[in-house]
Amino acid sequence: MKTFFKQVLAVVVGMLIVSAFTFLMGFIMLGAMLSAGDSKPVIKNGSVLRIDLSGNLQERVQENPVSAFLGMSGTEEQGLDNILKSIKIAATNDKISGIYLESGIFSADMASLEEIRKALTDFKKSGKFIIAYGDSYLQGAYYVASVADSLYINPSGMLDWHGIASQPMFYKELLEKVGVKMQVFRVGTFKSAVEPFIRTDMSDANRAMVQSFINDIWTVACKDVSASRKISVDSLNALADNYMALTDANDYVRTRLVDRTAYIDEVRETLRRLTKTEHLNMVSPAELAAYDESANGANGQIAVYYAQGDIVGSEVEGVISSGQQILGPKVVDDLDRLCNDENVKAVVLRINSGGGSAYASEQMWRAVQLLKKKKPVVVSMSGMAASGGYYMSCGADYIVAEPMTLTGSIGIFGMVPDASGLLTEKLGLHFDVVKTNEASDFGAMGRGINAGEAAAMQRYVERGYALFLRRVADGRNMTTAQVDSIAQGRVWTGRQALNLKLIDKLGTLEDAIREAARRAKVADYGIVAYPAPADWYTQLFSDVKDDYMENRVKGMLGVYYKPLQFVYTLQGTDCLQARMPFDPNLR
C-alpha cells in the first residue's frame, strides 16, 4: 500500500511539473506573439510592397495574435491607416522597388477606396512601378487597381464593371406576419431610415435622393478610371451596361480595361525582372508601416482621433451587435484628456459613421466645443460622416471630406415597437396594468401608443431636430432656415456638400492633418493616433469568443444578418436616433 501511494504521488507530482512547464511555455509563446508586432521586420533590397485588395477595410485594425493563432479571426480585416502609411513610406524607402496589388473580394466604402487610389497616384511620382493582378476583379478593387502601370487578369478571370446600385430591404410585411408593428416618429422629408419598417418600397423622395448621390459617386469613379486607362467616360458607361462580369477575359484586353491576360506565375516572373532579384521579397502594409516615424516631432503632436461605427450611449454587446462602435461617454472622456494634454497642439477627428444615438451625438458635440476653445479641431470625413456623424463634426473649426464621402442626413427619428399582435393574438399573452400616473406604462410592448403619447413623442423628435439645426447653423455660420432647406434628412456626397457649405474642402486625412498643423502654427510636429491601443492583457482576451461566434452566426443568417443587427442595435440604444437612412454599402 505504501508503494502504491508513492507511485500515485509520483504521478501527481509529474503531472503538476508537466502542467507548470506547459503553462510557462504557453505564456512564453504568447509573449513572443504579442511582442512580435513591436519589432521592425527586416526589409531587403529589391523588396515589393504587396497590398491585397481583399477582406474588410477598416479605419484601424489592432491585430489580435491570439485570435489569429487559434484560427478565430474570421474575415480578414485590413487597416486603411497601415495601407496609407505604407504607400507613403514605399515612395521614399530605397529598399522598396515598387508596389504589387493583388485583387480579391474587397469590402470597402468608395471614399476609402478613393483615398487609397489617390495615395497610389502620388506614389507614381517616385518613378517606381505599380503592378496589379487578379484572378478576378470586383468593381471596388478594380477602381483602385486601375491606377497601376500594368494591369493583369487571369485568362479565366472575371472583371465586374457594372455601375452602382442601392437595393434596400423592406421588413414591413415580415413584421406584420409575426405580429409586430413599428410606430414611427420622424422629421425630414428624406429621413428614410424608418421606411423598411413601414413601407414595401422606396418613397419618391428617398429614390430621388439615392439616385442623386449614386450618380455623383459613379461620375467620380468613371472620371478617375478614364484618366488612368485612357477610356472615355461614355465607353465606360457602355461597358457597364454590357454585363462585363460574364464576358471573356480577352474582351477586357480588347476594351483596354486590362493590359493583358496572365497567370500568377507569369506576373511573379515580371516582378522578379523588375526588381532584378531571383527570389521575390514581399512586405505587407503592416510590416512597412512599422517604419513610420511620423510620431516624432520637436514642436508637439497632432492627435488623430479615430471614431468609427454606430454612435451609442452605452456599449451594445452580443454576437449580432453592430461591430465597431463610437461610445459617447468614452469619446467625451478621451477628448477631455486631449484638451488637457499640453503636448497635443491640435486634434483631427477622423470620422466614419452613419450616426446613431442623438443624445450621445449631442454630448460629443459639446466635447468638441470645449476642445476647440484650447486648440484647433479639424474633421476628416472618411466613407461616412452622416446624421450623428455630421452632428459631432459640424462644430469643428474646419471640415475635410472625400468627394465620395456620404454626409449630411441632418434629421431625427424615433421608433417604438408594438408587439401586441405577436404577444397577445399569436402567443396568447395578456397584460393588465395598475399605475399611479398617466405615463407610467408608456412604451410597454404589450400595447400600441395612444394619441396623447404619439403627440408627445412627435414633439420630442421635433425638439431634437430643432436642436440639430441650431448646432449646424452655429458651426457652419448659417441660419437655421438655410440649414433646414438642405437638411430634412437628405444625404449628400462630399462634392455636393462642398457646394452647400456643409464642409470646407475636398481632401484626404493628410490634408486635414496639414490644415490642423497650420492652424496650430506648428511646423515640426508628430502625428499620434488615438484612442491608444489596448494593453496586452485586454488584447489577449478581447473578441476571441465574439469573433468566433459572430463568424458562425453570419454564416447561418446570411442576408438576414444585417436587418437583425440593425434592430438589435436600436433595441440597446436611445429612442431618439440621428442615423443614416439606409445601409450605405452600394453594390
Regions found by a protein language model. Give the residues of each.
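N-terminal type II signal-anchor transmembrane helix
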Residues: K2-V42, G46
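Charged, glycine-interspersed solvent-exposed loop segments at helix/strand-loop junctions
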Residues: P168, K172-T270, S420-L500, D504-L506, ...
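Short glycine/threonine-rich loop-to-helix capping motif typified by GTGT followed
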Residues: A358-Q363, Q496-N499, F541-D543
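C-terminal long alpha-helix characteristic of the crotonase
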Residues: A227-S228, D259-Q301, F413, L469-G475, ...
